Amino acid sequence: MLYQLYETQRALMAPFADFAEATAKLYKHPLSPFTHIPGAQRLAAAFELAHRLGMDYEKPEFNIKTVSSGGVEVAVQEQVAIDKPFCRLVRFKRFTDDAATLERMRAQPTVLVVAPLSGHHATLLRDTVRSLLQDHKVYITDWTDARMVPVEAGPFHLDDYVRYVQEFIRHIGADVHVISVCQPTVPVLAAVSLMASAGEPTPLSLTMMGGPIDARKSPTAVNNLAMNRSYEWFENNVIYRVPQNYPGAQRQVYPGFLQHTGFVAMNPDRHASSHYDYFLDLVRGDEDSAEAHRKFYDEYNAVLDLPAEYYLDTIKTVFQDFALVNGTWEVDGRLVRPQDIEDSALLTVEGELDDISGAGQTRAAHGLCTSIPATRQFHYDVPGAGHYGIFSGRRWRELVYPQVRDFIARFEKERMGDRAVTPAVKAQATRAVKKAKAIVPTVPPSTEVKAVTPAKKVRRTATRVAPAGAGVPVAAAAPRARKTARRTAIETNADDATTKG
């Protein structure tokens, strides 16, 4: 019933939002006589703010048309590699007539970005993709709004998410570097673990950013809500059926508008101040700041519904049972064993001020992946970065991306030196070794991350934590960045970043 009430309210607000937009133009258009009346600028600003507060936000576009590759502008085109009911695998294909540039781009690493299915669209990672395209061939998971998926397509569970990731990795090939941002760190680690257990080739590297691998560490408000409420509470209070005016009518979902309300409720003062600053920017005529506000909230306010089965599975598996770290998670009757991963390098990234995934939650992956050599495990704490700052905005571009780029390049270079060993031969050898050796016991959640951290106490600083015996650091530590203004808590400005991919 709540979903129907929301849709009714949205339909009633639409005419008022349109009226506010038209009135704002009336008071600010240079040819309008109302522009010259006293207070016209303030009236225009007030009506424009009212319009943005009442309007409906559609899914944005990636809108990455061209990027710079080695100083050469190349065209970028989105191509759908795989189209499934709940997700599209999108490739950002780069084109150029410059032979040298084309040859160089062909030799660049391939990256699969697994976007979160947690309320926002994959376009939230636009800045991530734009940066990666400078040095990589890029794919991304573009999750479908559940209200747009007909009931006939069937349910979508967390286990289905794991299968989707496996299918995408197999489609691209094992010579891929996987980057998971926030929520997908858990299913991605599960997907790769199951592939390793089956003797399949695994990705060259795994980069996990701000995800709840072990949600018990430094629990945040998000974690506490999931842990302190029962499974039945979520099932009875946040799951609703899609109204009849959508293709997915009668599908049970966790509505995006509820998730958005939760996002805003975490920092209400910050959002209120941001909107007031937007009003003042319009009054002053500061169009650059006003446009930055629009770009950010066009993305932030565009949300999608989550399949109910997937949402409830995530609550139980990740935040209540902690099945991954406890070694009890099974997918299709097979135990998820991160300790079986041997060939993939691992980089974890955490934000100093992350209020969604707390300190140590992502880093916990190192304590689970005990078969990855110490020299292939890395961790990076991003100074002054909140949750969104680790994958978007200035801190992502200046601090995090150089770390990720050099990490990928290091193990891509290692692959190039090992080309004589084909994936099939490596997989066959791996299966033979697994049959010959004893099963490695599951690592307890409390295990120290000795492969990643030195003996002294780890401090959350900008310096990358190098593994014991590591050689050249992944990337030089960047200077501590100044804290941004409250309106740019999530830095999503598509300013001067150029990409290729």
State each model region's role.
Residues 369-387:
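Catalytic histidine neighborhood in serine/cysteine hydrolases
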Residues 355-361, 373:
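Conserved alpha/beta-hydrolase "acid-adjacent" motif
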Residues 148-150, 160-177, 189-193:
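Conserved acidic catalytic loop of the alpha/beta-hydrolase fold
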Residues 341-342, 347-350, 354:
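Short beta-strand/loop motif that positions the catalytic acidic residue
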Residues 382-398:
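Catalytic histidine-centered segment of alpha/beta-hydrolase-like enzymes
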Residues 61-68, 72-149:
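Short, surface-exposed "cap/lid" segments of acyl-processing enzymes
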Residues 1-45, 174, 191-309:
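Alpha/beta-hydrolase-fold enzymes
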Residues 414-501:
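Intrinsically disordered, polybasic Lys/Arg-rich low-complexity tracts
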